């Protein structure tokens, strides 16, 4: 890895972390459901799917931009650890239905958005 790629990842990560902070802060919890975490994971999945689609469909995306958006921005924007912690907290509070919905929503929605982003890049 060269310095340019490392700096692209660091800069993308900084923007992604700040975006996660603000988005999660705007939509923290709705009736015990962690909407903010679902939203940041969804946005990151859509962007990552779009980036992957661009590469798959033959668009030339420079390596530093792939690093900035893919590893940096999307990596810092999405948050598997917070998703896991919030799900564990819901289970600990015996909110079994909400915990199950949280798991299903995060997995199904984010995979669907990766696919949607992938298909959007085809245009």
Curated annotation (Swiss-Prot):
This is Fluoride-specific ion channel FluC. Na(+) binds at residues 75, 78. Disulfide bonds: none annotated. GO terms for cellular component: plasma membrane. GO terms for molecular function: fluoride channel activity; fluoride transmembrane transporter activity; metal ion binding. It is a multi-pass membrane protein. PANTHER family: FLUORIDE EXPORT PROTEIN 1-RELATED. GO terms for biological process: cellular detoxification of fluoride; fluoride transmembrane transport. The keyword Cytoplasm does not apply. Belongs to the fluoride channel Fluc/FEX (TC 1.A.43) family. Its main location: membrane. Keywords: Cell membrane, Ion channel, Ion transport, Membrane, Metal-binding, Sodium, Transmembrane, Transmembrane helix, Transport. The chain crosses the membrane at residues 7-27, 39-59, 68-88, 101-121. It is found in: Cell membrane. It catalyses: fluoride(in) = fluoride(out). Pfam families: CRCB (PF02537). The keyword Transport applies. HAMAP family: FluC.
